[in-house]
UniProtKB/Swiss-Prot annotation:
It comes from the Bacteria. The lineage of its organism: Bacteria, Bacillati, Cyanobacteriota, Cyanophyceae, Synechococcales. This is Cytochrome c biogenesis protein CcsB. Belongs to the Ccs1/CcsB family. Required during biogenesis of c-type cytochromes (cytochrome c6 and cytochrome f) at the step of heme attachment. It is found in: Cellular thylakoid membrane. The keyword Protein biosynthesis does not apply. The keyword Transmembrane applies. It comes from Synechococcus elongatus (strain ATCC 33912 / PCC 7942 / FACHB-805). The chain crosses the membrane at residues 29-49, 88-108, 174-194. One of its GO terms (cellular component) is plasma membrane-derived thylakoid membrane. The gene is ccsB.
Length: 456
């Protein structure tokens, strides 16, 4: 009858040994540094390579011949998921492995160190003080004299008869744990933002109402965050120009409306001043000329859509028919919303400049420019992980501050007319040594004063 290898002591020993090696490897600081470096390189790659673009974009900007750096082409970018680095499985795997390494380090190193700092014992033999980095003995020293000196220096005291233990700065042991916890919260927020967030772009003319539909990039769990029961109305879009004609700032007056058209919120946004509503953030990112409003002779106002022309700079144009059958017409060209357009004939010759509120005769028609209608370019982002990331960084900052607190310990024993004192600190050793020397000097002065008083 053969024994079960799973129940044999040798297998159990190998299993425990394997577990121990695994957790030791996972908690290794070198592994954490390597993972952090890999995450940093991946994040930098995601910053350099445009994210969430179309296949045509990558084929145009990263051709196979010649490939960037000799190897980086659109095929590599798509196959490695470099077009959506922050949602790629390998990147999320790096974050999870880094989080596991931090967790293992916390429970195998930092937490035991904190528990050890909370456990203390009295030194009841003079020989115990010899193993401390800083120790001394004073003849005729008294614990009663030592206590107030330590209390003045914010030590917490524990005393039993002729032995004393004091400590200060336990927060210094808590600091690394808070740093690790904060980093774990940051990682969790980053993962949640990648899986549950989305990014959209919209180009909306003034006066139009829209719902978020043009999703550029989205996580697999982001569907519930796309609003279905409210929309945004662009009340007005306008641009402020500097005296030299340069754009100073562009603005969008936005209203959030429900299904019944009732306004729920209204804000005017501009660059670096977005609208936040319902977990979404609307950024002012771009602009365009949506349409030209013109009048032909005494006709009603006609709104003709304008399109950006494939030319250098930002130029928009539209075709203005001068005959009912659309067989003839002129081109209206504009480069901004300052109310000026240039009219070109069918042969490409310029016919004149037209300003807002003015008219020009072209091909027997009186053409008036009523207005140029602008479109606001909005970037819409939803990142449910941002609050967690901010909270995590708060934990990290508090932990870093706590880590600078020195954890100092002092032991004392009064025996056979001698006062034995010793101590140690995990940091700021010079300051701790100076502090202990000052305490010893005060004790020595008090002992001498007591001796002189006794002689007198």
């Amino acid at each position: 009858m053969t024994s079960d290898p799973l129940a044999s002591p040798s297998f159990a020993d190998r299993w425990r040994r394997g577990q121990q090696l695994f957790w030791t490897w996972l908690a290794d600081l070198r592994l954490a540094i390597l993972l952090l470096l890999a995450i940093a390189i991946a994040s930098a790659t995601g910053t350099v390579i445009e994210q969430g673009q179309s296949l045509a974009f990558y084929q145009e900007n990263y051709p196979t011949d010649p490939a960037l750096f000799g190897f980086l082409s659109w095929r590599w970018i798509l196959s490695l998921g470099l077009d959506h680095v922050y949602r790629a499985g390998w990147f999320l795997g790096l974050l999870i492995l880094f989080g596991a390494s931090l967790t293992a380090c916390t429970f195998r190193r930092q937490w035991p160190a904190l528990r050890a700092a909370q456990r203390w014992q009295f030194y009841q033999e003079p020989r115990q003080f010899t193993k401390l980095a800083l120790s001394a003995s004073l003849p005729q020293g008294k614990l009663d004299s030592l206590e107030p000196l330590l209390l003045q220096r914010r030590y917490r005291l524990f005393r039993a008869d002729d032995v004393l233990y004091a400590r200060r700065g336990l927060a210094g042991r808590v600091g690394p744990i808070l740093v690790h916890a904060g980093m774990l919260v940051v990682l969790g927020g980053a993962i949640w933002g990648s899986l549950g967030g989305f990014y959209a772009q919209e180009m909306i003319p003034s006066g139009e109402t829209f719902q978020v539909r043009n999703i550029v990039d989205a996580g697999p769990w982001s569907g519930s965050r796309i609003p279905q029961d409210w929309a945004v109305k662009v009340n007005r879009f306008w641009i402020d120009y500097a005296p030299d004609g340069r754009i100073d700032q562009f603005y969008s007056d936005l209203s959030v409306v429900d299904r019944e058209g009732q306004e729920q919120d209204r804000q005017t946004i501009h660059v670096n001043q977005p609208l936040r509503y319902g977990g979404l953030t609307f950024y002012q990112a771009d602009w365009a000329i949506a349409a030209a409003q013109v009048r032909l002779n005494n006709s009603p106002v006609l709104q003709l859509p304008m399109a950006q022309l494939p030319a250098a700079g930002r130029i928009w144009g539209t075709f203005v028919p001068t005959k009912p059958d659309l067989s003839s017409g002129v081109s209206l060209i504009a480069k901004d919303l300052q109310g000026t357009a240039v009219i070109y004939g069918s042969n490409g010759e310029p016919l004149g400049t037209l300003r807002k509120g003015m008219a020009i005769e072209v091909e027997g028609i009186r053409l008036s420019l009523v207005d140029l209608v602008g479109s606001t370019g909005l970037q819409i982002k939803s990142d449910p992980g941002i609050p967690w990331v901010y909270a995590g960084f708060l934990f990290v900052m508090v932990g870093v501050v706590c880590s600078y607190v020195s954890h100092a310990q002092v032991w004392a024993l009064e025996q056979d007319g001698q006062l034995y004192i010793g101590g140690r600190s995990n940091r700021a050793l010079v300051a701790f040594e100076q502090e202990m020397l000052a305490v010893l000097a005060q004790l020595d002065a008090q002992s001498n004063h007591s001796a002189e008083t006794a002689i007198a």
